Amino acid sequence: MSKQRIYEYAKELNLKSKEIIDELKSMNIEVSNHMQALEDDQIKALDKKFKKEQKNDNKQSTQNNHQKSNNQNQNKGQQKDNKKNQQQNNKGNKGNKKNNRNNKKNNKNNKPQNQPAAPKEIPSKVTYQEGITVGEFADKLNVESSEIIKKLFLLGIVANINQSLNQETIELIADDYGVEVEEEVVINEEDLSIYFEDEKDDPEAIERPAVVTIMGHVDHGKTTLLDSIRHTKVTAGEAGGITQHIGAYQIENDGKKITFLDTPGHAAFTTMRARGAQVTDITILVVAADDGVMPQTIEAINHAKEAEVPIIVAVNKIDKPTSNPDRVMQELTEYGLIPEDWGGETIFVPLSALSGDGIDDLLEMIGLVAEVQELKANPKNRAVGTVIEAELDKSRGPSASLLVQNGTLNVGDAIVVGNTYGRIRAMVNDLGQRIKTAGPSTPVEITGINDVPQAGDRFVVFSDEKQARRIGESRHEASIVQQRQESKNVSLDNLFEQMKQGEMKDLNVIIKGDVQGSVEALAASLMKIDVEGVNVRIIHTAVGAINESDVTLANASNGIIIGFNVRPDSGAKRAAEAENVDMRLHRVIYNVIEEIESAMKGLLDPEFEEQVIGQAEVRQTFKVSKVGTIAGCYVTEGKITRNAGVRIIRDGIVQYEGELDTLKRFKDDAKEVAKGYECGITIENYNDLKEGDVIEAFEMVEIKR
C-alpha cells in the first residue's frame, strides 16, 4: 500500500499544503516539498494537531449562533426607546434656530479692523529639489531673497535671485538659520516600472490565479495540449504547426482559475518567448516522448531558469508506439531537471494531449505548485500589467492583448501602454465576450489606444486622462529621440549599413595620439588603405587625451574617433555615450588599420558569382490546365533547391533561364531534393519542357574581397 503524500493529507482536511509543511518543520522533520510521503507516526502527530482544532472550531460556531439570537431580541427593545428620544430632541432644535439668526445679524455690524500681518516663522525643517534657486529657497525659509543674497555675499558667493544653489551652499545657509534640510527625491512618473510593486507584503492582497506559460520545441504538441485543456480547436488554423502569436486563455479547475500563455515554439520567436517567461508564474515544458530534448527545448529551459520560474515537465505523446518517457527524463537530467522519483524536485507528468490522458494530473500539479508559491495581488490597486500581443485592426483601430498583473482594469480607464496612451473603449475576454472589469491574472483585449504598442511593453492605469496623455506623449517623444540618436552616428559596426545608401562613400576619422610622430604615422597608414570606391577623410589630428570638443566634432561630421595610446577624459566619455559617438582605442597601429579596412570593405557593392548546385533529368511531362507543364524529374547530380535559379538545357544548348515555380516530392512541397530522388518541377513562365531535357540549378554566391 502506497504512503499518503503531504498534498493528499492537506486535501483531506481542506487545508493548504504549506500549513502541513510548516507544522512538520516545527516538529523538526525535514520536508523537501508537497510531494513528500508521510510516515504513520507523522500522520498521528498531525491528526492530534489539526483534527482537535477543527473540533474546537465547530463548538465555538454553535455557541456564537446562540449568542446572535439573544442579541437580536435585545436590539429590538433598544430601537423603540431611541425613536422616542429623537422626537423630543427635534422639538428643542426648533427654538435654537431662532437664536442663531439673531447672532448672525449682530456679527455683521462688528467688522474686523485692519491689522499688520505677523511675520511668518522660520520652519524647523525644509525639503528642496535639486537645482532650487535663491528665490525659491527664500520662500521656503519664509525670509526675503535679499537676506539670502546678503548671506551668500558674506560667504564669498555672488548670486542673484534666479541663481541655482548646490547642496553644500544650501546646508551652509540652513545651518545659519538653524533649519534642518532634506533633499526631495523626484520620482520620474514616465518610468512605468516604478508602479510595479511586490504584493506579498500588502495586507490587502488576496490570492490570484497562476499565470502558466507553455513552452517547448516546435510540433511537440504545445497548442494541442492547450486545445485539450480548453476543449476548443485552435491548432487547425495555424500555419505549418507554428503558433503565430502569443495567445492568452483562462480556464477553471476545481473552482480555481488558471491563465495560460501560449508562446511560439520556433527559434525565430526567441525574444517573444523570453518576454512570456517574464510575466509567468509556472512554466510547462512540453517534450515529445518519441522525440526527446531538442534545441528549442533547451532554449525554453534557459528562459525559465533565468526568470526563476518553476518548471513542470509534460511528457507528451505517450500513446505513440515509439514513445520512450524514460529517455526524456534521462536527457533532461543533464539540464538540472531531475524527476522526483529519482530524488530530484522537478515534477514530470506523462500525458497525451491528443487523447486527453493525464490532463487532470497536470492541472492538479499546477494547482499545487501555485499554492506553495502563494501568488497574491491587490484588486484595489491601480491596474498594471504587460502587453501580450498587439495589432492594427481595420475596423477597430489599434488593439492590444493585455495581461493584468495587479489591480483591476475597467472600461473607461485612462491608460498608458508602452509609448502609447488612450482611454479603454471596449474590453473583450479570451472567450470573445465583452466585459467591464478585469482583475489580476486576467487576459483581455482592449481598444481605444492611439497607436499599436510592442509585445512585452508594460501598461499602467492613471486616474486622470490628461496625465495619461502627457506621460504617453512624453514617452513617445523620448523613444523618437532615442531612435534618432541610435541611427544617426556612424560606427565601425554599422558602417556598411550607414554608407551603402549614398553614392559618396566617405569615412570621416579623428585621430588623437600620445606623440606627434605616432599621429602622423597612423594618418599616413590610413590614407594608404586601398579599397575601391571608398575614401578616408581625416578631419582632425592632435596630440593629447580625447576631449569633449573631439566628440562634438565627430558627432557633427558623423565620424569616428581613434585614440592611439590615449584615453578619453570623463567629459568626453559622458558626451560619447550621450551622442552615441564611436570611439576606438588602440596601442598597435596594425590593429587600427586592420579594423578600419575590414569595416570599409563592407562599403562596396557586393560581387556575386554563379555556382551550379545540381542537375535533374526530365523523365516524363504532364500538362495540367491552370498549372502548365509539370516535369517528373530524377536528380542526377548535387541537389535542387526551392529558391535556386534554373536553366533548361536541350542537346547541350540553353533553351531558357529563369526560376523554379514549384518543387514537390510526391504531393508535398519540398525545400530541396537530393541526388538519387525523384521530384516534380514547374518552371515560372515556361511550359515547353520535354523528356530528356536537363534542368540545371544554380545559386549566386557573394565573393569575399
Curated annotation (Swiss-Prot):
- Keyword set, alphabetical order: Cytoplasm, GTP-binding, Initiation factor, Nucleotide-binding, Protein biosynthesis
**Region spans: G3:** 262-265
Q: Where does GTP bind?
A: 216-223, 262-266, 316-319
Residues of the region (G2) are: 241-245
- Note the coiled coil stretches, chain numbering: none
Region G4, residue ranges: 316-319
Chief site of localization:
cytoplasm
Q: Where is this region: G5?
A: 352-354
Q: Which residues form the tr-type G domain?
A: 207-376
The record ties this protein, via InterPro entries, to: EF-G-like_DII, IF2_II, IF2_N, P-loop_NTPase, Small_GTP-bd, T_Tr_GTP-bd_dom, TF_IF2_bacterial-like, TIF_IF2
Compositionally skewed regions (Basic and acidic residues) per UniProt: 41-58
The record, for Pfam families, names: EF-G_D2, GTP_EFTU, IF-2, IF2_N
Q: Which GO terms describe its molecular function?
A: GTP binding; GTPase activity; translation initiation factor activity
Q: Membrane-spanning residues where?
A: none
- Give a short account of what the protein does: One of the essential components for the initiation of protein synthesis. Protects formylmethionyl-tRNA from spontaneous hydrolysis and promotes its binding to the 30S ribosomal subunits. Also involved in the hydrolysis of GTP during the formation of the 70S ribosomal complex.
**Which HAMAP family does this entry report, sorted A to Z?**
IF_2_B (MF_00100_B)
Note the PANTHER family from the entry.
TR-TYPE G DOMAIN-CONTAINING PROTEIN, TRANSLATION INITIATION FACTOR IF-2-RELATED
Q: Which family does it belong to?
A: Belongs to the TRAFAC class translation factor GTPase superfamily. Classic translation factor GTPase family. IF-2 subfamily.
Protein name per the record = Translation initiation factor IF-2
- The source organism is Staphylococcus aureus (strain JH9)
User: What gene is this protein a product of?
Assistant: infB
